[in-house]
Amino acid sequence: PRSRGLGDVYKRQVEGIRMFTEIPEEYLYKVYASEDFYNEHRVIFEHMDVELVSPQVMKEISDTMTPQGVLALVKMMKYSLEDLLEQEKPLFLVLENLQDPGNLGTILRTGEGAGINGVIMSHDTVDIYNPKVTRSTMGSIFRVPFVYVDDLLEVAETMKQKNIITYAAHLNGTDYTKEDYQKGTAFFIGNEGNGLTDKLTDKVQKKIKIPMCGKVESLNAAMASGLLVYEARRQRQGVD
């Protein structure tokens, strides 16, 4: 039987050289490496306590079918919603019930590129520490703040009170390029198949859409998120 890995409620498993070299040292809890990998890449393990394991053991503890030879347990990052919302003119992505690990990973990576201040997610969104998510972030998971919350309706209300303008990605919205994102901004993105729930859509201040040509009705969540945050970034460039 396949192993479920070594992670627990406080720590998560991260694999592969690319991801390993992205982990900030303060989050590293334990490092495992195969002897061959260790001998070949000694320089990346400087000043680290590394447990060497056989290829067989590495295969058993790995989440992938063909492990690269290095695996780390990392302490989970902890951020607070209150701290995130206190930032000046922040830019957020708010995700409701997103299920695809690749989508979430790409959203984090694209979000980092566009300079977002954080990702806020409903509890029924896919686990950000899912190995597929972690891998597809290419290290952004360690640099983009994120929180899971119980109630996105409450978050939308709090944002309104803090003068953060909330936007719902919605088929009945106005063209997203016609809005002004230079103030505090939060883009709400819904589940891949169903979009945002009606309740949350009604709570959010404005509806926006990405115009489509041909017979395409909508883009996937990751691509839509990317277009929205990069439009916000474009508008904010050169603005204090």
Language-model features: locations:
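Active-site/ligand-binding-proximal alpha/beta "capping" segment
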Residues: Y167-K215, N220
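Short active-site loop/helix that positions an aromatic residue
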Residues: F20-Y27
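Glycine/small-residue-rich loop that forms an oxyanion/phosphate-binding "nest" at active or ligand-binding sites
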Residues: V50-K75
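Single conserved hydrophobic/aromatic residue that forms the stacking wall/gate
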Residues: P1-L6, Y10
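RNA substrate-binding interface of SAM-dependent RNA methyltransferases
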Residues: L84-N172
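Structured adenosyl-cofactor binding patch, chiefly the S-adenosyl-L-methionine
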Residues: G113-A114, I128, K132-I141, D198-D240
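Alpha-helix capping/helix-boundary segments
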Residues: R18-F20, F37-Y38, V57, T125-V126, ...
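Short, charged/polar "capping" segments at the starts of alpha-helices
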Residues: E35-V43
